[in-house]
A protein has these predicted regions:
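Low-complexity, acidic/polar, glycine-enriched regions of mature
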Residues: 27-207
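Short stretches within intrinsically disordered, low-complexity N-terminal or propeptide regions
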Residues: 11-12, 31
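Selective for proline/serine-rich intrinsically disordered segments
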Residues: 2, 14, 35-37
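Bacterial N-terminal signal peptides
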Residues: 12-23
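N-terminal secretory signal peptides that target proteins for export/translocation
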Residues: 1-7
Length: 207
């Protein structure tokens, strides 16, 4: 069974993962732009994962997230660049032996981070539209790198406007084998082959 990484980047994946939750605000008093750039860290972003196993559901978290959210083109509100990195050795499933096994399968010494760099937000999530509907469900296209594998992924995104921020979250299912990750199952405890990465992040409307 595979780990649902929960990019409660509360982005990216970077992804990835998340990949595996983020908010965006408006820098000026216009509804056609975001309040960017904005940093990504543990105070505004979280990445977590859920893994189904033979006997139970395994929940995991990450920490020491770092990165940023910016616009490639200030005139294009869809040109969002989420640059998120997750340290593999911060993965915590509340069981040291299991954490070590997972980190070994991900070759954490050789590939210490999981990264996600976004390229484009879907058209239906323009800030002008969100200001009217207060929310949107769209996608964020980007590049996810895990171990020695880099793939373009389409990250599901839900953006909601709150009193003083935009909250962004979503979940991305991944196959272990697609990223050259050996089956991290321990002894008779089997993990699902699909990992669901969830993220959430929040960025204030104003600095």
């Amino acid at each position: 069974m595979r780990l649902p990484f929960k990019f409660s980047a509360a982005l990216g994946l970077g992804l990835p993962l998340v990949l595996c939750s983020f908010g965006i605000g408006s820098r000026v008093a216009r509804a056609d732009t975001w309040n960017l750039p904005s940093p990504i860290n543990d105070s505004n972003t979280s990445v977590s994962f859920v893994v189904d196993s033979t006997f139970s559901t395994i929940n995991g978290t990450t920490k020491d997230l770092f990165g940023s959210i910016s616009l490639k083109d200030r005139k294009d509100p869809l040109s969002i660049v989420v640059d998120l990195a997750i340290k593999v050795k911060t993965i915590d499933t509340d069981w040291d032996d299991r954490d070590e096994t997972l980190q070994e399968c991900m070759a954490s010494d050789q590939f210490p981070t999981v990264s996600f760099i976004s390229q484009r937000l879907s058209d239906n999530c323009k800030p002008t539209l969100i200001d009217i509907s207060k929310r949107c469900s769209g996608t964020l296209t980007g590049i996810l790198t895990i171990r020695d594998v880099t793939k373009e992924v389409t990250l599901p995104v839900e953006i909601s406007k709150e009193a003083d921020s935009y909250r962004i979250k979503g979940t991305l299912p991944l196959q272990w084998a697609d990223y050259n990750i050996e089956d991290p199952s321990i002894l008779i405890v089997q993990l699902d082959r699909t990992a669901n990465i969830s993220y959430e992040t929040v960025v204030p409307l104003k600095h």
